[in-house]
């Protein structure tokens, strides 16, 4: 076996491990506030943000989540904020491509952390740049009060 083949195989193995780690992290992030929070949500007859988006988007149409890893490792002193507490997907509704933004009420009752405002602004930028309609599915407690002084309606 040549040195190039050994290097390739080593790089391939490393990449597979990284992809596996990323997929595990994404599965954890998609639980939002966690399994117990999802169960409480369902017990109230409510759907999660991702469930609501999936029901809205055209069945079997392409879709892409934006910013799933946003806020990873942030706000740990408050229990974390998976995906910034907001789920954003680009997909199709009745054949028209659009952006859907949904507060994740399993994360601190959908309250806005500073990063949620930035993520929402980014969704609006993408919508404007690509001339896409934007749909909001709001289920939010409002601003996360311990950090309310850090949330502004602009980019900075």
Regions found by a protein language model. Give the residues of each.
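Terminal-region recognition feature
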Residues: 1-156
């Amino acid at each position: 076996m040549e040195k190039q083949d050994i290097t390739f195989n080593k790089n391939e193995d490393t990449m597979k491990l990284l992809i596996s780690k990323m997929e595990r992290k994404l599965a954890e992030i998609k639980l939002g506030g966690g399994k117990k929070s999802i169960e409480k949500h369902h017990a109230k007859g409510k759907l999660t943000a991702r469930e609501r988006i999936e029901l809205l988007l055209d069945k079997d149409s392409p879709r892409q989540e934006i910013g799933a890893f946003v806020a990873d490792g942030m706000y740990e002193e408050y229990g974390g904020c998976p995906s910034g507490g907001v789920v954003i997907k680009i997909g199709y509704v009745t054949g028209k491509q659009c952006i859907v933004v949904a507060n994740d009420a399993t994360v601190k009752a959908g309250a806005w952390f500073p990063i949620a405002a930035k993520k929402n602004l980014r969704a609006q930028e993408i919508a404007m740049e690509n001339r896409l309609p934007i749909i909001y599915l709001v289920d939010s407690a409002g601003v996360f009060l311990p950090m309310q002084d850090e949330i502004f309606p602009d980019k900075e």
